[in-house]
Amino acid sequence: MSVSATENDVPRFFVGCEESDELLDQSKPENLDNLYEHTEDEEDEEDDEYDSPPERQIVVGICAMAKKSKSKPMKEILERLSLFKYITVVIFEEEVILNETVENWPLCDCLISFHSKGFLLDKAVAYAKLRNPFVINDLNLQYQIQDRREVYRILTNEGIMLPRYAVLNRDPNKPEECNLIEGEDHVEVNGEIFQKPFVEKPVSAEDHNVYIYYPTSAGGGSQRLFRKIGSRSSVYSPESSVRKTGSYIYEEFMPTDGTDVKVYTVGPDYAHAEARKSPALDGKVERDSEGKEVRYPVILNAREKLIAWKVCLAFKQTVCGFDLLRASGQSYVCDVNGFSFVKNSMKYYDDCAKILGNIIMRELAPVFHIPWSIPLEAEDIPIVPTTSGTKMELRCVIAVIRHGDRTPKQKMKMEVRHQRFFDLFEKYHGYKTGKIKLKKPKQLQEVLDIARQLLVELGQNNDSEIEESKAKLEQLKTVLEMYGHFSGINRKVQLTYLPHGCPKTSSEEEDCRREEPSLLLVLKWGGELTPAGRVQAEELGRAFRCMYPGGQGDYAGFPGCGLLRLHSTYRHDLKIYASDEGRVQMTAAAFAKGLLALEGELTPILVQMVKSANMNGLLDSDSDSLSSCQHRVKARLHEILQRDRDFSSEDFEKLSPTGSVSQIKSMHFIKNPVKTCDKVYSLIQSLTSQIRQRMEDPKFADIQLYHSETLELMLRRWSKLEKDFKTKNGRYDISKIPDIYDCIKYDVQHNCSLKLENTMELYRLSKALADIVIPQEYGISRPEKLEIAKGYCTPLVRKIRSDLQRTQDDDTVNKLHPLYSRGVMSPERHVRTRLYFTSESHVHSLLSILRFGALCDETKDEQWKRAMDYLNVVSELNYMTQIVIMLYEDPNKDVSSEERFHVELHFSPGAKGCEEDKNLPSGFGYRPASQENESSKKHTHANDSDEDLGVCRRDEPDRALVMFKPMVSDPIHIHRKSPLPRSRKIGSVEVLSDNNSHLRTARLLEQKHIGLGFELYSMVPSICPLETLHNSLSLKQVDEFLSAVAAPSSDYQMDTPTASPSTPGFYTYVGGRKISLNTYTPTKILPPLFPVSTDVEMSDSVFQSCSSTSMVPGLAGSADNTERNHQAQDD
């Protein structure tokens, strides 16, 4: 929202009384004299003021019971509404409403009035008739909202789906409406039979005593719902008979998986939705750590958005709440509550005030001759200028993101032979597949119980068979007892059947070999998202909003509000996918929390908003099964790094055939790999020695390590690395280098309070080794990198291609039906977002595909050459690494033109390292097409060549820094108060230009320093800004590239595919016209297959089939069924 104010402006926000009438009269225009009581003197004053001319004030009256008008949500919204320059808010006192005649009520131009218990609706109706103000929520229809029978009648007339119901009216004057026959497991109401379970609702909407009756097969009885009392919202009763007095609605019980959806509209074009635990479930109100009822964020589908539109208009309630039941793939309205606010959502308060203010100003500004027009918000029209000076519309954002900061991953192997382990193995059907994974809390508890029992037995007798594993049993017990509870996402146990026992190859196993069957128990723990990782993800989510239209707007005092408005006004189609690793899923949830300004715990967000993508290998890979190419690569890597001599020129060619600057730099730093490993090993020995000293030192007795780790666990972590890194034959296990780097990076960042010596030296040496080992594990030569990358990423590449091409979902998911979109500004404009959260392997692999898959020709494309030079310098793809693809559409170009669609590619290597590197690689900044255009204006010529990009290089990172260095707000207290700047009035016509950007930058940096005192921030590395790799790719070029990469290996070639339905040579005939279909022509802009009449409401099925690519055979080109399967996931 535009902001126009001075420091002297203060919100005009006061409680009305009889004395206030005179004050209010002074703000009335003379042409409305007949509506208000005036004296001649007051009229003369008004004439003088009008000639001045004065600032006319629109008075908004709040007429409701004090409990409602002075509630926290109402105060929050009115406080924001008062910031409008021309709006003054007056609250009618409850005593005045109840005891004064309507002639003595305060005057207002706009009335917000609504019924609640004790409210005199008749008087409010009389006041509206007397004064004729602009009414936000229709008063007469509020009578009908109080009667569930009338509510259901209106909903039925509007074609809104309801549960099947019948009305029992116990009215002596209408005996035909009171036919009730009750059976053991059913009731018959006026000829309509309802089998148990069914619902019995009083016809009065003010009576919340709703009963649900259960069948005898389920135990009978009933659940009695009521208004929340403390922590209860229902109780179970053994009573199975229906009530015999009063009138009721009987309806079919809808199975909803234990959640109800509550929808809150502000006008027909905005709806906020939340899910809560159904009160019918167990009656226990779920509350979060702050004592608030847990509400789950919800994305409404197209039908639900249309329902919200209809409900708002049918009941003439601008601000309206209603309840949805999601059951059997449908959505049913079961209650309409009238005037209702969301609780505890600052984002909703901001949105509600803004929309109400605009509605009021739009209606009354012309009457008062106020020079006001509804501000054109950046987020209302998602269009950006490009380098060529044209306007392009953001259509799609795809991001692949690595998880946030995590604890070190740890693993322990032990061979077990006790019968209790075999019993557990058999219980979970291990003999069918030869292995089982135990992750659920109940399963882990069983393993812990076995470990405890065996250790007790060891204490009672010296059973040598068990004694051999005592230390490992102790560790198994210690790890499973960590945190005091099982969450199911941070520990797991694998059991593998070994018919002839375990082959003894590791230094940690005994030398003898037994031939009888055994089980290999592998305990994995750690690798969980840290509190710092959650902050990283949430803050990056906030920063991510800035990439969307309106992202630079300053409304509400925080950047990125454009995305939030886009999301809530039905024009954002968002889906978030995550692999099945706990750290990845929690990163996705934290990111979603920041992206959409959600509140509360992460678990409800995870449950409702993050889709698991592990069913088809989209984001997961079986790390236990390496490809033959990976085995060859690892063997060659280990061989080169085991040579006790300085790297030769031949070694440089063998290890870095791609010419990676970062790897060559590390090799120069290492010189002799074995000598460097010797240093690393001695430093680890020193570290374990220091930890033992700390354990014996009383000063460190109560020290609290990061994330509840103890000194004992820290010692075990390093002792195991010390033991495993150097094998019995004196050679080093190179595969342990990533683990060593992982651990020292974690301790340097999080456990610096121990003040261990030489940790930074160990960090530098292990990082140099890891910078060689980690990237090369995904291939050394280009062909190897591509082969391994395809093994990891082919399903994801197919899905990305599908996201860019197939947009039929956009027409049915992310906006209103066109027939109902006439009131929405730019209803066709919408953005599709797909976020994929995954682990390091997929990020490395996808980047390899982009770098080495021949997307562009470096010799001919200077921008791509510079991008490749930048990537060559990047040494590590750290936590929160991002690869972002953005698709724009120019609606002014022909549908078959290659210029219609425009793709941009951006990249960030994620979190910065523990040691500030002065030579940190710097690209050319974040340069979306919109900013390129601004830069071009600064130059004397309009050429958009790459040379110009180099000139503006130094300016761009500053902008990127503001946007993607996300340490700007305190994540713990982010919703402590409204982010709105309270001292300013929100005006209507001032637009923040780029000239104000330096002020915004200063404010963001100032905010950043405020949060630096918080303990968590010292542990959260800032994230490298996004760098633009390319900002002028065509969709055709990207699509053909992705198609070639995703093709089977035998067909894989980087040449353009031959003519097929997905190439420019393919034509189809639609309505007698020949239409050229290109890979760069998504179905969204194809002409309709038959004329659509606007006079008849189109059914959902027809609408979907009209949008579906199945109507145009072969449009997807050579993509196989896997791509279509991934697309089906989006539904």
Swiss-Prot record:
GO molecular function: 5-diphosphoinositol pentakisphosphate 1-kinase activity; ATP binding; inositol hexakisphosphate 1-kinase activity; inositol hexakisphosphate 5-kinase activity; inositol hexakisphosphate kinase activity; inositol-1,3,4,5,6-pentakisphosphate kinase activity
Entry EC no(s): 2.7.4.24
Pfam families reported for this sequence: His_Phos_2, PPIP5K2_N
Keywords assigned: ATP-binding, Cytoplasm, Kinase, Nucleotide-binding, Transferase
Acidic residues bias locations: 39-52
Biased composition (Basic and acidic residues): 25-38, 934-951
Gene3D superfamilies per the UniProt record, alphabetical: 3.40.50.11950, ATP-grasp fold, B domain (3.30.470.20), Phosphoglycerate mutase-like (3.40.50.1240)
Residues holding substrate: K67, K68, R227, K228, K262, R276, S340, F341, V342, K343
Reaction catalyzed: 1D-myo-inositol hexakisphosphate + ATP = 1-diphospho-1D-myo-inositol 2,3,4,5,6-pentakisphosphate + ADP; 5-diphospho-1D-myo-inositol 1,2,3,4,6-pentakisphosphate + ATP + H(+) = 1,5-bis(diphospho)-1D-myo-inositol 2,3,4,6-tetrakisphosphate + ADP
Residue span of region Polyphosphoinositide-binding domain: 385-456
Biological role: Bifunctional inositol kinase that acts in concert with the IP6K kinases IP6K1, IP6K2 and IP6K3 to synthesize the diphosphate group-containing inositol pyrophosphates diphosphoinositol pentakisphosphate, PP-InsP5, and bis-diphosphoinositol tetrakisphosphate, (PP)2-InsP4. PP-InsP5 and (PP)2-InsP4, also respectively called InsP7 and InsP8, regulate a variety of cellular processes, including apoptosis, vesicle trafficking, cytoskeletal dynamics, exocytosis, insulin signaling and neutrophil activation.
Swiss-Prot/TrEMBL domain comment: The C-terminal acid phosphatase-like domain binds PtdIns(3,4,5)P3 and InsP6. Despite its similarity with the phosphatase domain of histidine acid phosphatases, it has no phosphatase activity.
Family that this chain belongs to: Belongs to the histidine acid phosphatase family. VIP1 subfamily.
Name by which UniProt lists this protein: Inositol hexakisphosphate and diphosphoinositol-pentakisphosphate kinase 2
UniProt organism field: Xenopus laevis
